[in-house]
Curated annotation (Swiss-Prot):
This is Alanine racemase. Pfam families: Ala_racemase_C, Ala_racemase_N. The modification N6-(pyridoxal phosphate)lysine is found at residue 33. It comes from Xanthomonas axonopodis pv. citri (strain 306). Its cofactor is pyridoxal 5'-phosphate. One of its GO terms (biological process) is D-alanine biosynthetic process.
Length: 366
C-alpha cells in the first residue's frame, strides 16, 4: 500500500467546536461543506452530532449525503436552493435554507410547503457575492415573516475581511447589518471563523465556524485564541527512495534544485495529485522522523524530494509529516502563496484514517 495518508483527530475536532461555542457565547453551526474541508463530512458530522447545534453545507447534495448517513441534526444550505423542485426536498428532509436572492424569496413565498420551513435571510453587507440589498432584505422580511409556510426567520450576513485584524471593513459590515436588521425581531448570524477568533465585540445568536473547526489559523499570525486550536488533520507519508548526488547535480523537473555539496536526497510518496502544493519553494520544511528537512526541487504529481544530508539516519521507510502540528497547514499555505482552505480541500486521493471515534460513539467527552 502506498504510505500516504491523512490522520483525522476527531477529538481535536470536538475541542475546536467547543472553543467556537465558548468564544461565540452562542449557538454554532459546524460548517462541513466541501466534504468537511477535506476531512470527510459524514465522519466529522457523526463525531460532532452529540453536541453540535447543527451543521452547514453548501448545497442540497451535501445535505442529503448527511441525512442518508443518519445525521438528524439541523442542516443549513448556505447557498440556498437553485431550482424550485429543491424546495420539496428541503421540506421532506427537514433542512434549513438560506434565501439570498429575490428569486429565492419569491419561490419561498409561493411554495405550498407540507411543513413550515426555517429560512435564513441573507443581507449583502459588503461581501458583494450572495445576499440581498438592504431594500430587498427589508422587503423580504415583510413578505415572508407572516406566511404559514415559514416557521421562523434568522437574519444573517457574511464577513468579507475578518481575517484582516487591522481592517475596518468588518466593523463597517457589522454596523450595516445592525442598521438594516434593526427592529426586526429575529435571531442573527454574523460570525465565521475569523469573526469568532479575532473580533470579540461582535455578537450574534448563531455562529458559523468553518476553518477553525479543523484547527487552521485564518490569520497570518498567531493570537491568544488561535493558539488554542488543535490541528485535526496530519498529512503523513514515508521515504520510498534515497540517493547520493555529487555537487552540481540537479533534482527534479526544471532543475529547480541544484546540489551545492554532496547531497543525500530522499524521495517521499506525496505529490500535487495528493494535494501537496505543486509550487512549494525549495526549503519548505518537511518533518522527517521529527527532524526538519528542506524540500529540494519541484513537487511532482506523485512524489517530492527532500534534502537528507543533515539527517543521515533517515532511510527508506522513515516516516514523514507534511503538515499537522508541525509544520502547520496555515504556515505552509502562506509559504506557498495559497490558502489553508485550498490545501485542506484539495486532498482527494489520500486515504483518511480516523482517530478518536470511540469517544464519539460513547458520547460527549469534555
Amino acid at each position: 500500500m502506498r504510505p500516504a495518508q491523512a490522520s483525522i483527530d476527531l477529538e481535536a475536532l470536538r475541542h475546536n467546536y467547543r472553543l467556537a461555542k465558548r468564544l461565540g457565547g452562542s449557538k454554532a453551526l459546524a460548517v462541513v461543506k466541501a466534504d468537511a474541508y477535506g476531512h470527510g463530512a459524514v465522519r466529522c458530522a457523526q463525531a460532532l452530532e452529540p453536541e453540535a447545534d447543527g451543521f452547514a453545507v453548501a448545497c442540497i447534495e451535501e445535505a442529503l449525503e448527511l441525512r442518508q448517513a443518519g445525521i438528524r441534526a439541523p442542516i443549513l444550505l448556505l447557498e440556498g436552493f437553485f431550482e424550485h423542485d429543491e424546495l420539496r426536498l428541503i421540506a421532506e428532509h427537514d433542512l434549513w435554507t438560506v434565501a439570498a436572492t429575490p428569486q429565492q424569496v419569491r419561490a419561498l413565498a409561493e411554495f405550498q410547503s407540507p411543513r413550515p420551513l426555517r429560512v435564513w435571510l441573507k443581507l449583502d453587507s459588503g461581501m458583494h457575492r450572495l445576499g440581498l440589498s438592504p431594500e430587498d432584505f427589508r422587503a423580504a422580511w415583510l413578505r415572508l415573516r407572516g406566511l404559514p409556510q415559514i416557521a421562523s426567520l434568522v437574519l444573517m450576513t457574511h464577513l468579507a475581511r475578518a481575517d484582516e485584524l487591522d481592517c475596518s471593513r468588518t466593523d463597517e459590515q457589522a454596523v450595516a447589518f445592525a442598521l438594516t436588521a434593526g427592529g426586526m425581531r429575529a435571531e442573527t448570524s454574523l460570525r465565521n471563523s475569523p469573526g469568532l477568533l479575532g473580533w470579540p465585540a461582535l455578537r450574534n445568536d448563531w455562529s458559523r465556524p468553518g476553518l477553525m473547526l479543523y484547527g487552521a489559523n485564518p490569520f497570518p499570525q498567531d493570537t491568544e485564541n488561535t493558539a488554542q486550536l488543535r490541528p485535526v488533520m496530519t498529512l503523513r507519508s514515508r521515504i520510498i527512495s534515497v540517493r547520493e548526488l555529487p555537487a552540481g547535480e540537479p533534482v527534479g523537473y526544471g532543475a529547480r534544485f541544484v546540489a551545492e555539496r554532496p547531497t543525500r536526497v530522499g524521495v517521499v510518496a506525496m505529490g500535487y495529485a495528493d494535494g501537496y502544493p505543486q509550487f512549494a519553494p525549495n526549503g519548505t520544511p518537511v518533518l522527517v522522523d521529527g527532524q526538519v528537512c528542506p524540500l529540494a526541487g519541484r513537487v511532482s504529481m506523485d512524489m517530492l524530494t527532500v534534502d537528507l544530508t543533515d539527517h543521515p539516519q533517515a532511510d527508506i521507510g522513515t516516516p514523514v509529516q507534511l503538515w499537522g502540528d508541525a509544520p502547520q497547514v496555515g504556515a505552509l499555505a502562506a509559504q506557498c502563496n495559497v490558502s489553508a482552505y485550498q490545501l485542506l480541500c484539495g486532498l482527494k486521493r489520500v486515504p483518511r484514517v480516523y482517530m478518536g471515534e470511540a469517544a464519539a460513539k460513547e458520547g460527549v467527552t469534555r
